[in-house]
Amino acid sequence: MRHYEIVFMVHPDQSEQVAGMIERYTGSITEAGGKIHRLEDWGRRQLAYPINKLHKAHYVLMNVEADQAVVDELETAFRFNDAVLRNMIMRTKAAITEPSIMLKAREERVKRDEMKFDADVE
């Protein structure tokens, strides 16, 4: 089995359905004997440029270990799902399990905001 990094962007109006989509996609990977090494839901983010007149999208990152057949199935599922605006499936040399830069930045921002809130309370 090979390692892949998968990023897909979901229409912002469909953000409530992202959890179900993640469950469906991870389920198809694990049923075929694959493994999920990293799964990050980055939430709604501003796009660098408009896609279909949209300026925001819901981002999801997955690092998986799977067979080519499963990756082809995912690619087809992304293509026929109207809620998925864009997707990227990239093969990697090894499993990546550490948090991404995007997640680290969000955690640092949350910590900074908590510290600021604590300082304001005192």
Curated annotation (Swiss-Prot):
Gene name of this polypeptide: rpsF
Its function? Binds together with bS18 to 16S ribosomal RNA.
Molecular function in Gene Ontology: small ribosomal subunit rRNA binding; structural constituent of ribosome
Q: Which SUPFAM superfamilies match?
A: Ribosomal protein S6
NCBIfam families from the xrefs? Answer: S6
Q: What is the lineage of its organism?
A: Bacteria, Pseudomonadati, Pseudomonadota, Gammaproteobacteria, Vibrionales
Protein name, entry field: Small ribosomal subunit protein bS6
For this UniProt entry, what's an example GO CC term? cytosolic small ribosomal subunit
Q: Spell out the PANTHER family in the cross-references.
A: MITOCHONDRIAL 28S RIBOSOMAL PROTEIN S6, SMALL RIBOSOMAL SUBUNIT PROTEIN BS6M
Q: Which UniProt keywords apply?
A: Ribonucleoprotein, Ribosomal protein, RNA-binding, rRNA-binding
PROSITE patterns listed in its UniProt record: RIBOSOMAL_S6 (PS01048)
According to its UniProt record, which protein family does this protein belong to? Belongs to the bacterial ribosomal protein bS6 family.
One GO term of the biological process aspect? translation
* HAMAP family recorded: Ribosomal_bS6
**Which CDD domains did the record assign?**
bS6
Q: Does the keyword Ribosomal protein apply?
A: yes
